[in-house]
């Protein structure tokens, strides 16, 4: 069993869509600005919810079906195994549960968790998306009597988990970015909180650069191949 000893170096990981893509899940949006054929603003914004809640629910019902068939990839499993050597905190932009299913014990979900529901009134109390509530429809109510919706942070909503993500980053001994661009929020923003003494690794198949950390260590590879490389580096001699 993995342990999270406070005496071990603290590795903070920021993971994004490229991590889940290697498990066969759709990335956030493609080159034409669509997400699985949908306009992002129609299905992932609070305005879209007010306009057509059933359209939004149908979209996330389909995504849940997709998630159920996905499995953690080798990259997820290697991150979990690093808990044998490091105290690991994963800050993920992904709304799937692949990190948890791979065995990671501390995961902060910036954008929510699709396998949970919440009411429109209470953004903090969650309910498992299982059985009859795996697929949501207009009229499905939470115990507080209001409409159930996915536990997702949409465009136009606050990101409450950003505070614990920043706090974890400020305590990092090493920092890893995997599956997301350094040029967009929150990756660029979180990098500003990494202690100057902490090495920063970035796994990305494309060239990268950062104004925050020009000394970052770039592993030019996809998520799985890059994690094989990094795992070997971080466990050598341990």
Describe the role of every protein-language-model region.
Residues 1-238:
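Conserved catalytic core of sirtuin-type NAD+-dependent deacylases
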